[in-house]
Amino acid sequence: MKIIRFGVSMPEDLLEKFDTIMEEKGYANRSEAIRDLVRDFIVRHEWEEGDKEVAGTITIVYNHDEADVVKELLDMQHDYVNEIISSLHVHMDEHNCLEVIVVKGKGSRVKTIAERLISLKGVKHGKLVMTTTGKELV
């Protein structure tokens, strides 16, 4: 892979903050940190397009005592068998459960799945985190 060198201009204060954070995170140099920022920018664009294949996790916390939440969660996971790769179930306490669902598919479809799961009655909190499949990322 050919590497291209280019210059970046920015205010000194901004660069100082960037350098501080870069060091805290353990980057060896600015180039590595900037490459990660550019990759993240590309991945976010893929999500926004909606037609690119993405991967991600849907994390939900729910009260398993709530009427039909467990049945609905399982039914929905079977409805999206092509996109839902795996799930992890954790008992947080005697009433609350944490479910981490690993998904892969078109961004728009993954968002729809997350919205449906998170909006179920009995779900106390939910979050979708999407990333790239890595196929189109350099």
UniProtKB/Swiss-Prot annotation:
Binds 1 nickel ion per subunit. Ni(2+) binds at residues 78, 89, 91, 97. CDD domains: RHH_NikR_HicB-like (cd22231). Signal peptide: none annotated. One of its GO terms (molecular function) is nickel cation binding. Transcriptional regulator. Its cofactor is Ni(2+). Belongs to the transcriptional regulatory CopG/NikR family. It comes from the Archaea. This is Putative nickel-responsive regulator. InterPro entries: Acetolactate_synth/TF_NikR_C, ACT-like_dom_sf, Arc_rbn_hlx_hlx, CopG, CopG/NikR_regulator, Ni_resp_reg_NikR, Ribbon_hlx_hlx, TF_NikR_Ni-bd_C. Pfam families: NikR_C, RHH_1. HAMAP family: NikR. Keywords: DNA-binding, Metal-binding, Nickel, Transcription, Transcription regulation. It comes from Thermococcus sibiricus (strain DSM 12597 / MM 739). One of its GO terms (biological process) is response to nickel cation. SUPFAM superfamilies: ACT-like (SSF55021), Ribbon-helix-helix (SSF47598).
